[in-house]
Design a protein with these regions (language model features):
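Conserved inter-motif catalytic segment of the P-loop NTP-binding fold
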Residues: 17, 56, 84-175
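A generic secondary-structure micro-motif detector
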Residues: 30, 140, 178-179
Length: 196
């Protein structure tokens, strides 16, 4: 067994000695894991990340709203393919849309997914940049303080799914294509995933 070996880890130009869990191939082969629940059947399971990508205007936000209403209201995205039976709490964070547009998308998504409206109203929470007071700033998920605040909120509210719409408006970084610039956000995503 090689668990709990000390290694020097370099992170953001700082080195520190930390305990690292190391498994042999045999130990991994004998590990048992509980079944992960489907958030949306045959599409998305708990402890998984999903990123939706397409050119502008192809319906990414509509799809995100469909996922949110299906999970919170027991809806169906595609009959017989992507369905949800167990209701979960969802937090949708929107970085750019007008509140009136968000309201319209919510109502149309509830109808399109045949979700239970009262369940969606109870289980879906929305944080919108456009709903905030001017000049007070907004979440920057590239920033550790914003990340910590969001994680605390999610844990305190019992939220199972966080939907970020969209990356460019919620993560302030100099270069989205730079691996080093992405590292704080990647750390945040892994931190969220490990909290399950």
């Amino acid at each position: 067994m090689k668990n709990n070996q000390f290694m020097v880890i370099k992170n953001n130009n700082h080195s520190k000695k930390v305990k690292i869990s190391i498994k042999t191939a045999e130990e991994l082969a004998h590990m048992d894991f509980p079944d992960r629940e489907w958030l949306i059947k045959d599409l998305w399971r708990e402890r998984e990340h999903m990123m939706i990508y397409s050119p502008t205007g192809m319906g990414k936000s509509w799809f995100a709203w469909s996922i949110a209403t299906a999970i919170t209201g027991g809806g169906v995205i595609k009959e017989g393919l992507w369905e949800n039976e167990k209701l979960e709490k969802v937090l949708l964070i929107d970085g750019e849309m007008d509140m009136e547009d968000l309201k319209e998308r919510q109502e149309l998504s509830i109808k399109a997914t045949d979700a239970d409206q009262e369940s969606v109203y109870k289980n879906l929470q929305i944080i919108s940049r456009q709903d905030q007071m001017m000049n007070l700033g907004f979440l920057n998920l590239g920033n550790k303080e914003s990340q910590k605040s969001l994680i605390n909120y999610v844990e305190n509210e019992g939220i199972r799914v966080v939907i970020l719409d969209n990356f460019s408006t919620l993560v302030d970084m100099p270069d989205e294509n730079s691996a080093s610039c992405m590292q704080p956000f990647q750390d945040f995503l892994l931190n969220m995933k490990q909290r399950e």
